[in-house]
Swiss-Prot record:
PANTHER family: L-2-HYDROXYCARBOXYLATE DEHYDROGENASE (NAD(P)(+)), L-LACTATE DEHYDROGENASE
Keywords, alphabetical: Cytoplasm, NAD, Oxidoreductase
Gene this chain is encoded by: ldh
Assembly and interaction partners: Homotetramer.
The protein, known as: L-lactate dehydrogenase
Reactions it catalyzes: (S)-lactate + NAD(+) = pyruvate + NADH + H(+)
UniProt: substrate binding residues: 87, 119-122, 147-150, 224
């Protein structure tokens, strides 16, 4: 079976994703669609030079009609977040962009899997599913996977342990109402909260650092893209290779955590070649459960405001 990916949006995230994907798995065809057709064509030429090392991949600039026989459509297109702007502030700007993408992709006959990383990702993933009419398992958002990576990096630095020994998640909205699932976090097989120094003040400091890191990067260099691009590559690789992968993604909830709203929210889920296989409901303490439900309410209220 041919492995074909259509990338919509060739900005910093999209361009780095394309680079990472070719280094992560074998792709038979990668088509890049962007309003700036010269940039898309230029990136294809640049990426083509990598194939000497990564293996042969057909690379070209294209349009939405190229989704017809694609396995995955990755949406990174959108207005970037400005310093001081919340992800939810972006909704009105990016909703119109999303509609202009999803409608022609579906009209092409696309029957694969949507992967969304444009912000606010939980809302735009929910809207992608509603606009496309696709089964919920075939629409995935990057969710809190980047937040969770930042949490693991921070804990590894503080505890001076390898990153791979840290098992910790950020859940909820990829944005202001996200929270750390400290009560279930494990480091080297030991509960995080059993480690010396993991006081309430220390946990608050870690949470603040993780929450503010994205804004700090934006202030210093204008945008974040390396982390989310690599996360996208991992997600698409799991789909193309049909390998089970557990990540905290924007996934549809069906009563997990007592949330019955028709929304996508950052939660641990298993993905593979069929899309989202199932949600893994993590144990939360009372405070975390309240935060999860409050985060869902934030997303639902924003969606309701769109009419």
């Amino acid at each position: 079976m041919s492995r074909k990916v259509l990338l919509v949006g060739d900005g910093a995230v999209g361009s780095n994703f394309a680079n990472d994907l070719l280094q992560t798995t074998q792709v038979d065809e990668l088509v890049i669609c962007d309003l700036n057709k010269d940039r898309a064509a230029g990136d294809c030429l640049d990426l083509e030079d990598m194939t000497y090392f990564t293996g042969q991949t057909k690379l070209r600039a294209g349009d939405y009609s190229d989704a017809a026989d694609a396995d995955v459509v990755v949406i990174t297109a959108g207005v970037p977040r400005k310093p001081g702007e919340s992800r939810l502030d972006l909704i009105k700007k990016n909703e119109a962009i999303l509609r202009s993408i999803v409608d022609p992709v579906v009209a092409s006959g696309f029957s694969g899997i949507f992967v969304v990383s444009a912000n606010p990702v939980d809302i735009l993933t929910t809207l992608t599913q509603k606009l496309s009419g696709f089964p919920k398992k075939r629409v995935i958002g990057t969710g809190t996977s980047l937040d969770s990576a930042r949490l693991r990096v921070e804990l590894a630095k503080r505890l001076q342990v390898p990153i791979e020994s840290v098992n910790a998640w950020v859940l909820g909205e990829h944005g202001d109402s996200s929270f750390e699932n400290f009560s279930s976090a494990v480091v080297n097989g030991k509960p995080l909260l059993d480690y010396p120094g993991m006081t309430e003040a220390a946990l608050d400091e870690i949470e603040a650092h993780v929450r503010e890191k994205g804004s700090e990067i934006i202030v210093k260099k204008g945008a974040t893209y390396y982390g989310v691009a690599m996360m996208l590559a991992k997600i698409v690789t799991a789909i193309l290779e049909n390998n089970d992968l557990a990540l905290p993604l924007s996934a549809p909830l069906h009563g997990e955590y007592g949330i019955k709203d028709e929304i996508y929210l950052g939660t641990l889920a298993i993905i593979n070649g069929q899309g989202i296989s199932h949600v893994l409901e993590l144990p939360l303490n009372d405070s975390e459960l309240a935060k999860m439900r409050a985060s869902a309410a934030t997303i639902k209220a924003t969606l309701d405001s769109l009419g």
